Amino acid sequence: MQAAELCNRQVVTASRDMSIPDAARLMRDQHVGSLVVTDTSDGKPMPVGILTDRDIVIEIISRDISLDEVSVGDIMTYALLKVTEDENIFDVAQRMRARGVRRVPVISRLGELIGIIAADDILELLSEELSLLSKITMREAEQEKAKRS
């Protein structure tokens, strides 16, 4: 399976100049823990970073910095892991594990943002596949037992 098949195409995004209170409200309103920060190139969103709820807590609140003094671009993570739409989902999982990230933007070959994959999405896929494999094993055992009776 390719990344494009699993990714959520409803990505909540922010600009670098968005205020932290606005970003936090957007996260709350959209029920997400991160915002993909984008710049626009020829009208297309290009991911340049990610802001997580944890970033807000660690970088601002724990340091007692005024929310009005910083913007998304000041605290977002710039070293953004991105995967292309045609990458194998197992390769995506390995890259996420190696970098220690739970969410990764999916981009087109031209670098345009097309979706996002969360670790939970991969876990759900694997869980479904394992469940189906388990059912096959149980069905084969039942068929074998029926043949012998």
Residue spans for each PLM region:
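A broad, low-specificity signal for short, low-complexity segments enriched in glycine/proline
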Residues: 12-13, 40-45, 64-67
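Generic signature of intrinsically disordered, low-complexity, basic-rich segments
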Residues: 19-20, 58, 115
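A glycine-centered beta-loop-beta connector
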Residues: 27-30, 35-55, 96, 104-120
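Short, flexible active-site loop motifs that bind/organize anionic cofactors or intermediates
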Residues: 10-13, 46-47, 82, 112
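The conserved cystathionine-beta-synthase
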Residues: 13-32, 37-39, 83-100, 106-107, ...
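Tandem CBS (Bateman) regulatory domains
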Residues: 1-9, 50-84, 88-97, 118-149
